[in-house]
Amino acid sequence: VLMFNQTYVAKDPAVGELLRNRDFRIALSYAIDREKIKELAFLGLGEPRQGVPAPNHPYYPGDEWAYKYTEHDPDKANEMLDSIGLTERDEEGFRLLPNGERLDLEISVVPAFANWTDVGQIVVENWADVGIRAHVEIRERALHFQMRNTNDLMIEIWNEDTTGFPFSGQPK
């Protein structure tokens, strides 16, 4: 599951504002080719959906929420990114922040989970297709958690407990 840090302000408050923008997150969701991730990173196993409790769980929110924003639709992603004002691009086609700097998102992964790096790389490629520059940062687990606790992660890939466990390791 990609987890966007909606309280991020560490290096660039403008990036933090985007991470808190619902339409920005939805646009990036539409840009992701989950079928490709399933085939290449998970050997064709699994089902692309949101990180919600499993269908047999009493807190399953229903199929509408489980599959919301999961279709791969780069055109819709581009339209949404344009609609929130990310229309300016650099010479390589990457979108620019309002200050003219290139938007560059960091996805943090822990190497203990080998396929997470692969997932991150596919997401980076998908986002590049809609003009969003991103990169995967592979970190040792202790550093990853330290950065999570100090609010220094932009985006992370972490597992989702689909049993509906009521507590989370995410800072609130």
Task: Show the residue positions of the predicted features.
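Extracytoplasmic/periplasmic ligand-capture domains
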Residues: 1-43, 47, 52, 57-172
